[in-house]
Amino acid sequence: MKSLEEAQKFLEDHHVKYVLAQFVDIHGVAKVKSVPASHLNDILTTGAGFAGGAIWGTGIAPNGPDYMAIGELSTLSLIPWQPGYARLVCDGHVNGKPYEFDTRVVLKQQIARLAEKGWTLYTGLEPEFSLLKKDEHGAVHPFDDSDTLQKPCYDYKGITRHSPFLEKLTESLVEVGLDIYQIDHEDANGQFEINYTYADCLKSADDYIMFKMAASEIANELGIICSFMPKPFSNRPGNGMHMHMSIGDGKKSLFQDDSDPSGLGLSKLAYHFLGGILAHAPALAAVCAPTVNSYKRLVVGRSLSGATWAPAYIAYGNNNRSTLVRIPYGRLELRLPDGSCNPYLATAAVIAAGLDGVARELDPGTGRDDNLYDYSLEQLAEFGIGILPQNLGEALDALEADQVIMDAMGPGLSKEFVELKRMEWVDYMRHVSDWEINRYVQFY
């Protein structure tokens, strides 16, 4: 949409009665206000008002100013699974200015750094999710009782039994402009992935939030729990949000170089950007894998099906899914992020890390073509390959020690993020689990 008049006609033509003024909190969870369509201009000018203190991560006290969500007209779209509704993505404003605690605003700041060089970061985010249900005791299981194969990846029967959900989700997302190009059953029972075409990184993050909104609500209509939780089952692979990326100048990819002697098709710019990602990987873990549960996914070793698919090893390689960064020809795939991350914040942190690598001309070293799951920690250390933090506490330590990533987040947001995540870590460490009760009560 390019004008208010065009947008109003669009809403009238599609019988839209309400517009959801939507943004995300610090956790990447969608927040909305439902606004009658006749007041669209209000969202575009003054914004929809929210009590800032009621939103995670705003840093606004109960006696502080309102958080005003001002819509970006180009993001207006229908919500096909919710007839009569449209969605408008908003940026947070406080006292008339873009708010530095808003993660979409933070991403725009990093995008501006790229724009100064004439660059655009394009990303393709890959959503993995689990379709689940709870039994009468509250325990969680795959929704499909027949989905029990030890190696279920790409299973025909498994994907076919969920076709009502997958088809409605796909059709809804296509209607709002996502170019869905493949759907598959992943390597855990009840786990699926849907891929759609890449976009500039801001639109890509907007699309990912739309995907999660659609998947959760369409599943709910069918009595299914659609979860992006990183590791719902301890003995099965977890849910990632792999981030494919390349930088372009509006004419061509600046990451691709067919003369690359390594055969990976990467330019010097891509290698330096990659060097920055590897150098800042421990701190990136806190932002890209920001929950206690995230680190159940990022363990070293194998699973029942042969691999965890976890990117626990700080290395890169040609089409190597055992490394932190896989190299499909001419681009990077960062395998670290999971479905619990805030895509705006994760992307902003990745840009900051990559640009630091470019500024310092960091060398990522030689790529690894071997299966890193085969090696012990001692062998990996001999190779000079580090591993990611193995719990949220370690990741937060790495984040606080990394001034590049902290600066990219900004002083207020970084402080708020670390404080909230420290609270989560402490709550977890104080919790007495069933595992502990079963193991220790009678033993001692």
UniProtKB/Swiss-Prot annotation:
Pfam families referenced in this protein's UniProt entry, alphabetically: Gln-synt_C (PF00120)
Gene Ontology terms: biological process: glutamine biosynthetic process
EC number: 6.3.4.12, 6.3.1.6
UniProt cofactor(s): Mg(2+)
Induction statement: By methylamine.
Family listed: Belongs to the glutamine synthetase family. Type 3 subfamily.
Top-level taxonomy: Bacteria, Pseudomonadati, Pseudomonadota, Betaproteobacteria, Nitrosomonadales
Protein name from the UniProt record: Glutamate--methylamine ligase
Role description: Catalyzes the formation of N(5)-methyl-L-glutamine from glutamate and methylamine. In vitro, can also use ethylamine, hydroxylamine and ammonia, with 75%, 40% and 1% activity compared to methylamine, respectively.
